[in-house]
Amino acid sequence: MNDYIVVKCGGSMLEQLNDVFFDCIKKLQQQYKVVIVHGGGPEIDAKLKDCNINVEKRDGLRVTPKEVMDVVQMVLCGSTNKKFVMNLQKHNLLAVGCSGCDGKLLQVQPVSEEIGYVGEVSYVETALLKGLINMNYIPVIAPIGIHDNEIYNINADTAAAGIAAALSAKELILITDVDGILHEGKLVKKTDESEIATLIEKGVITGGMIPKVQAALASLKMGVQKISIVNGTKDFTEDTGECIGTTVTRGVSIV
């Protein structure tokens, strides 16, 4: 059991997770060393609204001045992370919640001054993750990082991809509420970068699936070898540890 698997669960999925999801994590843990990265967008937006803080978005990124970053940190590292950890432990999965600033885990470069405290992963200090896993814990990571002793928000997809690349993980699993990419009603089990572009052009990939496949493509560029898009509300793992969904790699042809 030397291979790592990184599981990314978006904030919108956290409330939808059922017993099946946690059973799948148990199956993965029998085969691999598991790291989980989570988002928290809906809970962050709700808390910002409660605080009467208006939020602007540019190119899909939340403009994050200091007052917004304080709320992001409070939600991601506090309530969202701890509720997820408690849910895992309720299902007999030992977990430890961390943020990217713990142990200098996620170091970032600011994206731009215009959008404030938003960073892209520049370095991953994997020692903390490996130490926790060696003690049989699942690290559960809130996607914030550090730069010059300041805390920055990180897109959860790119945080997960950065961690997966740094660990040379066998696979990055993106948890969604759909079975994967569908073509004429049938699941596309394998695809690659060039084919995804074609499927978007043909209108096969539309709506909410587009950002999911874009996250997969970005992960490939960061060095991740294999990304699976799976339905977290269903059984998404075989007993062998293989995923049931759409797998995105380089140079694989389907359809």
From Swiss-Prot:
Coiled coil: none annotated. Pathway: Amino-acid biosynthesis; L-arginine biosynthesis; N(2)-acetyl-L-ornithine from L-glutamate: step 2/4. The keyword ATP-binding applies. One of its GO terms (biological process) is arginine biosynthetic process via ornithine. Transmembrane segments: none annotated. It is found in: Cytoplasm. Its EC number is 2.7.2.8. It catalyses: N-acetyl-L-glutamate + ATP = N-acetyl-L-glutamyl 5-phosphate + ADP. The record marks 8, 212 as: Transition state stabilizer. It is an enzyme of class 2 (transferase). Keywords: Amino-acid biosynthesis, Arginine biosynthesis, ATP-binding, Cytoplasm, Kinase, Nucleotide-binding, Transferase. GO terms for cellular component: cytoplasm. Gene3D superfamilies: Acetylglutamate kinase-like. Pfam families: AA_kinase. Substrate binds at residues 40-41, 62, 153. GO terms for molecular function: acetylglutamate kinase activity; ATP binding. InterPro entries: AceGlu_kinase-like_sf, AcgluKinase_fam, ArgB, Asp/Glu/Uridylate_kinase. Catalyzes the ATP-dependent phosphorylation of N-acetyl-L-glutamate. Belongs to the acetylglutamate kinase family. ArgB subfamily. NCBIfam families: argB (TIGR00761). This is Acetylglutamate kinase. It comes from Bacillus cereus (strain AH820).
